[in-house]
């Protein structure tokens, strides 16, 4: 699970050594390092499958986390993601294509739609999701909490659910307001209700 952090850790160690920090201190710090919040972060809530939250919000980022998640998936790989509003809309179908190529179950939802209509953003992602191969599925669920709940309720033991796009963020920007929203808390909330 920590593969995503290897390059960052190697860079940090190189800098620490260049700054002449002793090796024991470096090892002690690394032993206490749980990873960067919202970056390939495991969310444990007693579920029979793996849930990972990641900030991946670009085509390259989504591809990398899904490839890593695929390498640890014994069952189906789920991805719940959306794209931000008022941002590069050309990446939306590209991210849809990546999700469909690398995941078994794709759930497209809202991210931070900002001033854009969430349905328009989802439709632009869905342009790449028209020809769904046999054995795969695509769901379009605009409300992010509902999309996450859907994946959590449908996943089976040994599946991996990647909730991508918001990572460490604890808010969602909807038109003229910002609300509290944290993907990690939504997972915990779902399992507390069970």
Predicted regions: what they are:
Residues 1-4:
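Conserved small/polar residues in nucleotide/adenosyl-binding loops
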Residues 11-194:
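ATP-dependent carboxylate-amine ligase
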